């Protein structure tokens, strides 16, 4: 085992202090976890009643369909086995670049940093990290010409919770106080 110690000035006994630190037993930090309670999907904001399917229409490629719900949400579903264990989700909302003034500068490049890491409801980024730890879930934000978008690549075991995470973000975005 080798170690390198780089300091701003030479002090007597540094080699011995480094050797003692490396030989000391490792102890888990008692203050590393900020909360004793595990974060679960039940900690996300609660929604109202689920919408019902109003129509299902085949579109485009075989297996692709457009689904309209009673709350106005539209879903384009393309179930296929082209990518094993992958579920791609793209949620479009709002008006994207069209929502901004053509004459005033807008820092739309900061949308991902400001909106995604800002939390959901009362959950901050740390709680969201705990919630998604060990799962294939994500939340990328982008601004298109005609819509804002949330994207993620997940897997069959996690896609329902991924959709719930997106819905919660749109329903009750939070602001992480950090």
Stretches with model-predicted labels:
Residues 36, 176-177:
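Short, polar/charged, Gly/Pro-enriched helix-capping and turn/loop motifs at alpha-helix termini
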Residues 1-7, 82-116, 120-172, 178:
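M16 family metallopeptidases and their MPP-like homologs
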Residues 1-94, 98-101:
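Proteolytic maturation boundary segments
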